[in-house]
Design a protein with these regions (language model features):
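A short acidic, Gly/Pro-enriched loop at the edge of an enzyme's catalytic core
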Residues: 121, 134-144
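Conserved Class I S-adenosyl-L-methionine
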Residues: 191-217
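Conserved beta-strand signature within the Rossmann-like core of class I S-adenosyl-L-methionine
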Residues: 175-183
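Class I SAM-dependent methyltransferase Rossmann-like catalytic core
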Residues: 30-58, 62
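Core SAM-dependent methyltransferase catalytic element
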Residues: 227-255
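A short SAM/SAH-binding and catalytic strip from SAM-dependent methyltransferases
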Residues: 141-159
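Conserved class I S-adenosyl-L-methionine
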Residues: 64-73
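A short glycine-rich, Lys/Arg-flanked "PGG" loop and its adjoining helix->strand segment in the class I
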Residues: 82-83, 159-174
Length: 255
């Protein structure tokens, strides 16, 4: 019994070590994607805080990969992904129906946001559809979402996050990755924090993704900001653009 308990403890320790392993190396092709001259100045000014090269390395986005940028906003990461996967790869900017409506209410038409990108990057496709019916033209290697996962929980979206995650799970290739970045909420916060503060608890995301069949394989701390304790709205002037953010990488089992 003691030997079995010891073996279980060692296995747990090894698994934890793998999840918290050192950050993967940034390759020259990743650096080149970030240095792409086609990126607008408004995007490059945000690089210091968003650390795009490190994000490419964490997600494992390399030439030839098929990637979905889920709820892509103005396309900050979409451009970088399209350059990173190269002509033999493919990137899909996936706009959920409710997300489309929200952008339009802000005077930001999704098709207009992507028009310039589609002219520049021939490997880019744009998808409009319900998140609970998430589907892609081909199986994908990586589904990425940054600073939007919490929104899916809000009343305005009126959907079940479990249905969304199950649909994403189905779209991925066996061994594919689901990468989620978002504003960290204090673990003592209530579930309504997604709407009041625009944050979400790390434990909530882990529980939801694992319930859909994913396995947590990596966590990153490149976007950690100790000055943000997770109790303020992310739009407060003293933390805007410098919020503490978690990085979680989940994998669909290979079999």
């Amino acid at each position: 019994m003691k030997r079995a308990s010891l073996s279980l403890a060692m296995a747990t320790l090894l698994m934890s070590s793998a999840v918290l392993a050192a950050a993967p190396a940034v390759t020259e092709s990743m650096k080149a994607a970030v240095a792409d001259s086609g990126r607008p100045e408004a995007d490059t000014k945000r690089d210091e805080n968003r650390k795009p090269a490190e994000m490419l390395a964490f997600a494992g986005i390399t030439p030839g990969k098929v990637v979905v940028d889920l709820l892509p906003g103005g396309g900050y990461f979409t451009r970088i992904f399209a350059k990173a996967v190269g002509p033999n790869g493919r990137v899909y900017a996936y706009f959920g129906t409710q997300y489309d409506e929200r952008l339009k209410s802000q005077g930001r038409d999704p098709d207009n946001l992507m028009a310039d990108l589609k002219r520049t990057y021939k490997n880019l496709g744009v998808i409009h559809g319900p998140l609970t019916g998430f589907v892609t033209p081909q199986p994908v290697d990586v589904v990425w979402t940054s600073l939007n996962y919490h929104d899916i929980h809000n009343r305005s979206y009126n959907m079940d996050i479990h249905d969304v995650n199950k649909a994403i799970f189905k779209s991925l290739k066996p061994g594919g990755f689901y990468v989620i970045l978002d504003h960290t909420a204090a673990e003592s916060a209530g579930d309504d924090v997604t709407e009041t503060l625009h944050r979400i608890k790390v434990s909530t995301v882990k529980k939801e993704a694992e319930a859909a069949g994913f396995r947590l394989v990596a966590e990153g701390d490149a976007l950690h900001h100790p000055g943000d304790d997770g109790t303020k709205r992310v739009f407060e002037n003293d933390i805007r653009g410098k919020t503490n953010q978690f990085m979680l990488k989940f994998q669909k089992p290979r079999r």
